[in-house]
C-alpha cells in the first residue's frame, strides 16, 4: 500500500464538524507554520501527549506557529456522544487551554490525513510549512529538534526534508511508548481492565523518572 500523503505533499484541508476550543479555522494561511496533532480519548498516552503539546505551544508562543489538536477517530453511538466525550477529555487533560481543538466524526480528516499517510495509530503529529506543504509526519517528541529548523527555514535541503537522527535516549523513549501502547491495546481487546494499570506500574518500577508513565498512572486511576 502506497502513501498518498508524504513529506512535501500539499496539506489536506481542515474539515472538522466542531471547534471545541479556540477560534474556528477554515484553512491554512500561507506564511504560517502549523502543528497538527491527532489524538483520541481511547489512546493510552494521548492525554500526556496533549500536555506535551501545550508545553511546546508555550515554548513557541512568540513565533508564527499555530498549534491544533484534532480528534477524528472516536467511536461512540452518535457524533454527539463522541463530541461530549472528547470535550470532557480535553477539560481533564488541558483545562483552560487556548490551543485550537477540533472534532470530526465524518471520517474525512481520518481518511485525508491519517490513512493517506499510512498513520494507523494516534497520537500522530504533522507540521504544515509556510508554503502549505507537509514538512513533518511523526512523533511529537521529535519536534524539539524539528520545529526550530522549520521556523528558521533550514529544515529543507535541495527541496527535500531530512528526518533528524534519533538519539539512543529518544529511540528508547519511543520504543517504550509503542510497547506500552501495544500492551494496553491488547488488554483492552480482551477486556482485561486491570492490565493497563499493571503495565504502567511495572514501567514505573523500571523507569521511576518517566513523566510519561506517571501521567498515565494518574490518567488511569
Swiss-Prot record:
GO BP of this protein: nitrogen fixation
InterPro entries from the UniProt entry: AhpC/TSA (IPR000866), Thioredoxin-like_sf (IPR036249), Thioredoxin_CS (IPR017937), Thioredoxin_domain (IPR013766), Thioredoxin_ResA/DsbE_sf (IPR050553)
Instruction: Cite the Pfam families for this sequence.
Output: AhpC-TSA
What UniProt keywords are attached to this protein's entry? Disulfide bond, Nitrogen fixation, Redox-active center
The keyword Zinc is annotated on this UniProt entry: no
Q: Which Cys-Cys disulfides exist here?
A: 43-46
GO MF entry, a single one:
antioxidant activity
Q: Which domain of life is it from?
A: Bacteria
- Thioredoxin domain mapped to chain residues: 5-156
**SUPFAM superfamilies found in the cross-reference section:** Thioredoxin-like (SSF52833)
Give the UniProt family note.
Belongs to the thioredoxin family.
Q: What is this protein called?
A: Protein FixW
Amino acid at each position: 500500500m502506497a502513501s498518498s500523503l508524504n513529506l512535501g505533499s500539499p496539506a489536506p484541508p481542515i474539515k472538522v464538524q466542531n471547534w471545541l476550543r479556540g477560534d474556528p479555522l477554515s484553512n491554512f494561511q500561507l506564511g504560517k507554520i502549523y502543528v497538527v496533532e491527532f489524538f483520541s480519548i481511547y489512546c493510552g498516552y494521548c492525554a500526556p501527549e496533549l500536555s506535551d503539546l501545550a508545553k511546546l505551544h508555550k515554548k513557541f508562543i512568540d513565533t508564527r506557529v499555530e498549534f491544533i489538536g484534532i480528534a477524528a477517530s472516536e467511536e461512540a453511538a452518535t457524533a454527539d456522544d463522541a463530541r461530549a466525550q472528547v470535550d470532557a477529555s480535553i477539560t481533564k487533560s488541558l483545562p483552560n487551554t487556548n490551543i485550537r481543538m477540533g472534532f470530526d466524526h465524518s471520517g474525512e480528516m481520518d481518511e485525508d490525513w491519517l490513512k493517506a499517510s499510512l498513520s494507523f495509530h494516534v497520537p500522530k503529529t504533522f507540521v504544515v510549512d509556510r508554503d502549505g506543504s507537509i514538512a513533518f509526519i511523526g512523533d511529537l517528541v521529535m519536534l524539539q529538534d524539528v520545529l526550530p529548523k522549520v521556523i528558521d527555514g533550514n529544515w529543507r535541503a535541495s527541496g527535500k526534508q531530512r528526518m533528524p537522527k534519533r538519539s539512543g535516549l529518544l529511540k528508547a523513549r519511543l520504543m517504550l511508548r509503542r510497547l506500552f501502547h501495544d500492551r494496553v491495546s491488547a488488554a483492552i481487546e480482551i477486556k482485561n481492565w486491570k492490565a493497563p494499570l499493571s503495565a504502567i506500574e511495572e514501567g514505573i518500577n523500571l523507569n521511576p523518572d518517566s513523566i510519561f508513565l506517571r501521567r498515565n498512572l494518574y490518567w488511569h486511576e
